[in-house]
Curated annotation (Swiss-Prot):
Alphabetized UniProt keyword annotations: Amidation, Cleavage on pair of basic residues, Disulfide bond, Receptor, Secreted, Signal
Protein name: Calcitonin receptor-stimulating peptide 3
Molecular function GO terms recorded: calcitonin receptor binding; hormone activity
UniProt propeptide residues: 26-79, 122-125
An example Gene Ontology CC term for this record: extracellular space
Residues of the signal peptide: 1-25
Length: 125
């Protein structure tokens, strides 16, 4: 029963669209009869357009690659140690990586394996 209401509605809507000017056929061109009319761009404009297109493509690919690598990235963190032994080892490493000038000028005299650790008690007099 609802089917009989549909064709009059369809015909009425097509008529309204035609009267409103929204329903027009596209102009027909013969593909073989007329020559291809391309947009006129100068050589410089074409090169600028090509550069812009390549730049956008590279930027798009870089964004996609960055999003893919974000999912699989593993960040490394150094263990932090603030005890005297760790700080001493860090300073010794820094001194060994710096030059001999720093070693000669700033190296403390009483540094070595006997300095760290447990010291013997001095006998009291």
């Amino acid at each position: 029963m609802g089917f009989w209401k549909f064709p009059p509605f369809l015909i009425l809507s097509i008529l309204v669209l035609y009267q409103a000017g929204m329903l027009h056929a596209a102009p027909f061109r013969m593909a073989l009869g007329s020559s291809f009319d391309s947009a006129t761009l100068t050589e410089e404009e074409m090169s600028l357009l090509l550069v812009a297109m390549v730049k956008d493509y590279v930027q798009m690919k870089a964004t996609v690659l960055e999003q893919e690598t974000e999912d699989f990235s593993i960040t490394t963190q150094e263990r932090s140690c603030n005890t005297a032994i760790c700080v001493t080892h860090k300073m010794a490493g820094w001194l060994s990586r710096s030059g001999s000038v720093v070693k000669n000028n700033f190296m403390p005299i009483n540094m070595g394996s006997k300095v760290l650790g447990r010291r013997r008690r001095q006998p009291q007099a």
